Amino acid sequence: MPHTQITLDCAQSQVPRVEALLEALGALAITLSEPDDEEILEPGPGEQRLWSHLRLTALFDAATVDPLRLQARVAEVLGAPPRGWRVERLVDRAWERAWMDDFHPMRFGDRLWVVPWGQTPPAAEAVNLRLDPGLAFGTGTHPTTALCLRWLDGLPLQADTRLVDYGCGSGILAVAGCLLGAGHCTAVDNDPQARQATADNARRNGVGERIRVQGPGPLPRAGADVLVANILARVLVAMAGELSPSVRPGGRIALSGILRGQVDQVRACYSSWFEMERPEYQGDWALLAGTRRG
């Protein structure tokens, strides 16, 4: 399948907003590099980007992306035409998997490790999630995914826990929840490629029978003990009336994909349903958690 690669330069302070826009417009993968092209991909948990300007390279399905429209949207976010804008058409799949060279085992919380498929877990006695995300979002290296993984690691998930992973991407949160003890998970995504990646990763980790993968649709009322949604803030706002009642009274919710400046807006949409906790932050990104009111 041919792909279109978009490259641009922007200030570090603008990266989260541009990343969020590119993801919303269908980016399959995003690479970050410093001016001399030393790739860092996504920073690991606790790491900080050290350069004042960064280069973003995003991969899109060539059949669905409009580079001119995309350039105009990026210019709106930046307030000026993007610097270093370059459009390339790619034929082979080698670039899509380049991140694998820099994807190493990572620990989240007290128990959970995310380990690239084919590598040896550093701690055999830990909860080890073997991951091959394909082209779906979610390796654990992005701050939003890392925040959600640490949150799940801190929950007392049990065999009767019903988990919903809304916007499942690679399935990393659904699989992690089941490996950490949840008996059943419903994983939802509108992208067929993400649903396939989730099913594959669930099977490889031995939890395929406990994860139901589906496209968007009505969720059972009060059917979830735990719901995690790592999507964009504007989608969380729009779906508050659908996601909130799907969590049972006393159940837990975690919302991520939220920039610092979007926290108050998202919290306001869910606070009538949930007793919201103080946000957790990693860099410019936030996680909001809460307990469903009775």
From Swiss-Prot:
For the keyword Methyltransferase, the answer is yes
Per the entry, what this protein does is: Methylates ribosomal protein L11.
Name the reaction it catalyses. L-lysyl-[protein] + 3 S-adenosyl-L-methionine = N(6),N(6),N(6)-trimethyl-L-lysyl-[protein] + 3 S-adenosyl-L-homocysteine + 3 H(+)
Q: What is this protein called?
A: Ribosomal protein L11 methyltransferase
Binding-site list for S-adenosyl-L-methionine: 145, 167, 189, 230
- Supply the EC number(s): 2.1.1.-
The record's similarity note reads:
Belongs to the methyltransferase superfamily. PrmA family.
- Parts of the chain that traverse the membrane: none
Q: Where in the cell is it found?
A: Cytoplasm
Q: Give the SUPFAM superfamilies listed for this entry.
A: S-adenosyl-L-methionine-dependent methyltransferases
The main place the protein resides is cytoplasm
List the keywords (alphabetical).
Answer: Cytoplasm, Methyltransferase, S-adenosyl-L-methionine, Transferase
One Pfam match, given by its short name, reads PrmA
Q: Which GO terms describe its biological process?
A: methylation
Source taxon at top rank: Bacteria
Molecular functions per Gene Ontology: protein-lysine N-methyltransferase activity
Q: Which GO terms describe its cellular component?
A: cytosol
Species in which this protein is naturally found:
Alkalilimnicola ehrlichii (strain ATCC BAA-1101 / DSM 17681 / MLHE-1)
Q: Which residues form the signal peptide?
A: none
